[in-house]
Regions:
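Cap/insert and terminal regions of metallo-dependent hydrolase folds
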Residues: 2, 8-11, 19-122
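Binuclear metal-dependent phosphoesterase catalytic core
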Residues: 119-142
Length: 142
């Protein structure tokens, strides 16, 4: 699922929890801002293995299942590149990147695909001035 918003010549699309989708890419074609969720398969797989190692099978099952309904950071970058969007904002970042160094692992390979992105945090916001091509990050975090 995704939501497409257009106003005064500007367009943004917000994805829901979803795997890489040709429909989202089609609706995102040429838009100004793609707001896309993403999950690091590398980090979540490590969490799965850690849960198994300590015998937490319910948690391991969750970490295994969530791959089925999330897009990876690289897949979201591919959508942004192939749809020729103005900017990609990652939101609903899984897992939370609350330990130093995780951001680099989460973003691994993204720069090789699409460079006009922001890794969102709570409070990140953008402005799309009417009838222009300008994309302005107005706030980086709370």
């Amino acid at each position: 699922v995704a939501y497409l918003f257009s106003y005064k010549g500007r367009t943004a699309l917000i994805s829901g929890d979803t795997t890489k989708s040709a429909n989202i890419q089609a609706f995102a074609a040429g838009i100004d801002l793609l707001v896309h969720e993403a999950l690091s398969n590398t980090l979540v797989s490590a969490m799965h293995d850690a849960a198994l190692a300590v015998g937490n099978l319910p948690r391991a099952m969750i970490f295994d299942d969530i791959h089925d309904y999330h897009t990876s950071p690289k897949e979201a970058a591919e959508i942004a590149r192939d749809a020729d969007v103005g900017h990609l904002l990652y939101y609903h970042v899984v897992p939370p990147l609350d330990v130093l160094g995780l951001e680099a692992v989460w973003l691994d390979g993204v720069d090789d695909i699409f460079q006009k992105y922001t890794l969102g945090q709570d409070g990140t916001s953008f402005s799309l001035p009417p009838n222009s091509r300008e994309i302005i990050k107005t706030k980086s975090k709370l």
